[in-house]
Amino acid sequence: MSGRQRSVAAAVHHQRQLSDNPLDMSSSNGRWLQSTGLQHFQSSANDYGYYAGGQGGGGQAARGYQNAQRGNEFFGEPTTPQYGARPTNQRKNNDESEFSPGLLDLHSFDTELLPEIPVSNQLDGPSLFNPSQGQSFDDFEAYNKQPNRSRVLAENLAAEKERMNAVAKIKVVVRKRPLNKKESTKNEEDIVDTHANCLTVHETKLKVDLTAYVEKHEFVFDAVLDEEVSNDEVYRETVEPVVPLIFQRIKATCFAYGQTGSGKTYTMKPLPLKASRDILRLMHHTYRNQGFQLFVSFFEIYGGKLYDLLSERKKLCMREDGKQQVCIVGLQEYRVSDTDAIMELIERGSATRSTGTTGANEESSRSHAILQLAIKKSVEGNQSKPPRLVGKLSFIDLAGSERGADTTDNDKQTRLEGAEINKSLLALKECIRALDNDQGHIPFRGSKLTEVLRDSFMGNSRTVMISCISPSSGSCEHTLNTLRYADRVKSLSKGNASKKDVSSSTMNLRESTKIPLSSALPTPSNFDDDVNEMWTEENDEFDASDYEQDKQMWKKNGKLEPSYNGMAQERIPKPTIQMKSRDMPRPDMKKSNSDDNLNALLQEEEDLVNAHRKQVEDTMNIVKEEMNLLVEADQPGNQLDGYISRLNTILSQKAAGILQLQNRLAHFQKRLREHNVLVSTTGY
């Protein structure tokens, strides 16, 4: 037995020397064994009984060489031939210049069967390479020096990691808040049921005969949090998994979306502080002495303009660099090293943020607030250079979306703010839709908000969306719009299962087409507003494929199917609704004109403020010139004619500047009156 082991060890040692070019051999396995002096290896392999009888010695030696490379044991089923073994009569032994197909198959099988190797049980049983049987650890060198094995394992792990990252690129979480006092006073009911990562909305509708019925809408997301979930659990579910990734050159973003008063600010407020604690802990322990630094910045987007919340609302400018990366010029960043400083900065910025009272919420956020935690690393050996950005974690508290019907008691300025908010949210939705459809052009420049969020959806990024919904029956339409919006975002994540509501949403569209007056019976005074509002929301969900399917239902044998049963009233309005869908460009044209007017008003406002600022600067220069003139007038021997001439010139300059500013102001007032924005002209 010891002689047989020595012969096998010698065979393995000799094969290791030839492993650099294992295919450079003769096709005749018997001649190959003779040339290497391994004639006795054939009998040794037969004694182990690993191959079935009748096989040639060359095939057995090749199998022994394969198992020597893999480090497998020669125990198990002794009479069972290995899968894929070829008889010797199929091998080409005539021409010595040709390779043996058996040896070529060994290498292909080696790569194919690699994941099936039971590594954990390598040293169990009577293995030929077990050191307890008298052999040294040098015999393992042939097994350890296998670049193909490690390369395949590395490629498999990299591919698996890439697949996991692709699935988790965008995570959508829905949070349901409890009923508030205002909703409880109105006796509104909770119409949202949550279970695991699913939720169901029970929408109450009316048929044509005013019979009430309940329609269920089911949605599936990555996580659904009910009203009992605390902010700590929200953080563990949403932000905590992405915090370690920002040290790996990844930009992560967490933003909250929902109607005004749905709890977005309440949800987002504690998340940055909790994330900063974890970041500092990683910097001080896991990445200690690696030069990482934490910087905090806080700004808002109000009325299409950027303001620094940590520098007394200083106005900022957004620019793009040569790499098409968004840069905010003038944004103040504060380096922090403890959570107390971060808490102070967050409280100071939150107190400066623009808020207002609307018909739907007494403390509504009227701006999009962006808090950024940037990880930077100092340049080694050169402390004079600024640190380079490694990763970034952004928290975006979006302003609440609102409908025109909810803002009837708001003033003109609040309505103007709401129009700008809805415009930016619509631009964000268009970007998400373009990404979902794999379009070549993504309209990120539709608003300032989408420009800021560009790096959140492009490149190596991670995004967490928290959709906040209200459970009350009075906010059912808002809730469904928010959930459909979140489902659109979720569709960006490849391989997701959040398409559960596709069939129900298609049924909802058909149902609304059948009974257009089932949702409500508006009064004549509000009918036009409700129709415009209905088309604003329905146009986003309209699909030509659904129309074609409905068209097949209308027709039977090339004609409209006559029916005089109880469903006749539901079939009659369909052509009317279809005629309205043909007129869809009209509301789009009206909406585009409204956006153009809004942009023009905002631009004129900015021009007026800049003109006023320039007038103040010119006035200060004129005042300095007047003071110098008075000093010269007090000097003895001053010429009176020169004093009068210079004074006349100064007064003319002052009058011309004031007149020009008054004309610009009067023109701007006229434009505001045309668009019914100014409530009164008091104070002008």
From Swiss-Prot:
Cross-referenced Gene3D superfamilies: Kinesin motor domain
Cellular-component GO terms for this entry: microtubule
One example GO MF annotation: ATP binding
Feature: compositional bias, Basic and acidic residues: 580-594
Coiled-coil ranges (or none): 596-626
Stretches the record annotates as Disordered: 1-31, 71-103, 574-594
Residues in Kinesin motor domain copies: 169-492
Keyword tags: ATP-binding, Coiled coil, Microtubule, Motor protein, Nucleotide-binding
Amino acids binding ATP: 258-265
Comp. bias regions, Polar residues: 18-31, 79-91
Changes seen on gene knockout: Enlarged petals and leaves.
Cited InterPro entries: Kinesin-like_fam (IPR027640), Kinesin_motor_CS (IPR019821), Kinesin_motor_dom (IPR001752), Kinesin_motor_dom_sf (IPR036961), P-loop_NTPase (IPR027417)
Organism domain of life: Eukaryota
Keyword ATP-binding applies: yes
Keyword field contains Transport: no
GO BP terms in the entry: microtubule-based movement; regulation of cell wall organization or biogenesis
Family: Belongs to the TRAFAC class myosin-kinesin ATPase superfamily. Kinesin family. KIN-13 subfamily.
Function: Acts redundantly with KIN13A to modulate cell wall synthesis and cell expansion via the THE1 pathway.
Protein name in UniProt: Kinesin-like protein KIN-13B
Protein species of origin: Arabidopsis thaliana
